């Protein structure tokens, strides 16, 4: 595996930013591995939470080892405390993640540009971001996963007490019932269109303070007929749980969803 660090200037953000990327370098026992066939790599964009940054996944989990076993590239970008949205007063992170970042990553890394090979996941704030980005732009991603995500703001008591920047990010009216930021409304819009079917994975520990928010989102999504692979078990809002569940996310990506090169026949 190669661990690549990239600093670059973002035209959308108007400032410098960074990502880390894990790139398979040697073939595994998977006979269909992209590295064997010299084809562009399937890719997981992996998002961090509110109290961490783009380095957290490599610092607190064994994601590099897990990715090597799956022959998948992992791109871990930085988002500050933005909730992956175009802030009311601040940076346009949603535009950055849906437009600029994929183009830059595709230019610099040996990854596939095909929707069928592109996935997005995240924890906590990043779980919200993964679902927000995927539900808003299902043309870009084949699947999305949320680990302990902040998926239903209506279920979180006094979110501005947890995040003083709340009005700066979402504006004075907040995120609930906002068609650009409320995941329930985005799920309704997604469910009304069958143009880009997408697989969704959701998990949360039963002792997590976001457990009720996760159950509420799952209930609403199921009412809409959205098929979500859901897992729950004892667990809190901490890295031991996320290290375990990111393995579940990678296992959840069936091999027939990973791009295989066309045969010569």
Regions found by a protein language model. Name each.
Residues 1-265:
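Non-catalytic cap/lid and distal C-terminal segments of serine-dependent acyl enzymes
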């Amino acid at each position: 595996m190669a661990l690549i660090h990239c600093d670059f200037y973002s035209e959308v953000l108007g400032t410098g930013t960074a990502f880390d990327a894990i790139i398979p370098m040697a073939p595994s026992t998977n006979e269909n591995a992209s590295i064997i066939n010299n084809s562009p790599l399937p890719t997981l964009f992996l998002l961090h939470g509110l109290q961490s940054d783009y380095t957290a996944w490599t610092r607190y989990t064994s994601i590099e080892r897990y990715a090597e076993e799956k022959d998948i590239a992992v791109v871990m970008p930085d988002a500050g405390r933005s909730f992956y949205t175009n802030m009311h007063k601040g940076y346009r992170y949603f535009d950055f993640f849906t437009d600029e970042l994929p183009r830059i990553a595709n230019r610099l890394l040996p990854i596939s540009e095909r929707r069928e090979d592109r996935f997005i996941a995240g924890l906590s704030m990043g779980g919200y971001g993964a679902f927000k980005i995927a539900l808003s732009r299902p043309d870009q991603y084949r699947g999305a996963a949320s680990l302990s995500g902040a998926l239903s703001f209506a279920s979180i008591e006094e979110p501005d007490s947890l995040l003083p920047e709340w009005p700066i990010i979402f504006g004075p009216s907040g995120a609930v019932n906002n068609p650009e930021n409320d995941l329930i409304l985005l799920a309704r819009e997604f469910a009304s269109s069958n143009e880009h079917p997408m697989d969704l994975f959701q998990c949360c520990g039963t002792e997590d303070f976001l457990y009720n928010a996760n159950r509420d989102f799952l209930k609403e999504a199921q009412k809409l007929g959205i098929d979500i692979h859901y897992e729950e078990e004892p667990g809190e809002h901490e890295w031991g749980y996320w290290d375990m569940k990111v393995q579940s996310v990678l296992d959840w990506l069936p091999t027939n969803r990973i791009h295989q090169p066309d045969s010569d026949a």
